[in-house]
């Protein structure tokens, strides 16, 4: 009985951790554009600055996020970065423009996994 109780507690803990990770949150975001347009991304695709993609240091390629600032946009992780300070997400110019992030350029955005 004791082992079953511990197993149930461990399972509940894992479920709560998994659901909180998948829930989303906020992160410091920036955008990148012209200089990288047409170059190869970390996953081998050609970067399209007008597309709705993003770079993240560790999320798996293909991960889809709904990113919100003044509006919301769905993006797919296809590159690595950003590598400047505390920034965690680098949106394509098109995605940043869709949510109103091109000016100021860097700010906290909210996100959820989709």
Task: Describe each region flagged by the PLM.
Residues 2-114:
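Secreted/periplasmic proteins
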């Amino acid at each position: 009985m004791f082992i079953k109780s511990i197993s149930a507690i461990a399972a509940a803990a894992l479920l709560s951790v998994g659901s909180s990770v998948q829930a989303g949150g906020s992160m410091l975001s920036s955008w990148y554009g012209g200089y990288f347009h047409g170059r190869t991304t970390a996953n081998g695709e050609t970067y399209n600055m007008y597309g709705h993609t993003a770079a993240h240091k560790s999320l798996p390629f293909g991960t889809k996020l709904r990113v919100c600032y003044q509006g919301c946009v769905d993006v797919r992780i296809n590159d690595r970065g950003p590598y400047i300070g505390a920034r965690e997400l680098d949106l394509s110019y098109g995605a940043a423009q869709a949510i109103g992030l091109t000016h100021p350029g860097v700010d906290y955005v909210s996100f959820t996994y989709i």
